[in-house]
């Protein structure tokens, strides 16, 4: 049985910057090496970097699909999904054959939020599914952490806003 006290969701933008890639890799590596299971959505950007870093650190990770288990989205992460099943899990609430649909992502985000003791947003613009996940986590009474970024950079606006609104500032693991 999964011990939720030892899980952390790592979420953020699909259009990751070099800074976002670096900080996501650093934090996911350190958290996985410390024994936490990393939970994310297997999307391009932050999700994929977090999963890869957790695996490379010898840790466990859980990928939550917004499609049926038999639908590889994004197709670029087909191999990563296979690797995750060897030391973690791939989960979905959607039946096999369920294709990608925009309305599936809030449901996927809900599952990510429920599987984790806390959620770390490493890079996100103001309009981001990661902020939806952070809002769900807040309503569940769990901790939201966010990485601060350049106040002039659009991909930092979501994280900076979360910190302004009370999220814990994450600078290192």
What are these regions (language model features)?
Residues 1-173:
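Glycine-biased, small-residue-rich flexible motifs in mid-sequence functional cores and linkers
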């Amino acid at each position: 049985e999964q011990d939720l006290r030892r899980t952390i969701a790592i979420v953020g933008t699909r259009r990751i910057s070099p800074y976002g890639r670096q900080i996501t890799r650093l934090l996911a590596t350190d958290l996985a090496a410390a024994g936490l299971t990393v939970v994310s959505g297997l999307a391009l950007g932050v999700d994929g970097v977090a999963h890869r870093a957790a695996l490379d650190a010898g840790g466990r990770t859980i990928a939550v699909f917004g499609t049926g288990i038999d639908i590889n989205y994004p197709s670029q992460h087909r191999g990563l999904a296979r690797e995750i099943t060897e030391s973690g899990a791939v989960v979905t609430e959607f039946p096999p054959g369920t294709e990608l649909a925009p309305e599936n992502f809030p449901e996927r985000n809900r599952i990510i939020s429920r599987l984790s003791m806390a959620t770390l947003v490493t890079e996100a613009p103001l309009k981001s599914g990661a902020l939806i996940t952070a809002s769900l986590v807040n309503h569940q009474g769990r901790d939201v952490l966010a990485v601060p970024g350049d106040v002039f950079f659009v991909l930092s606006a979501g994280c900076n806003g979360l910190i302004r609104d009370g999220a814990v500032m994450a600078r290192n693991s």
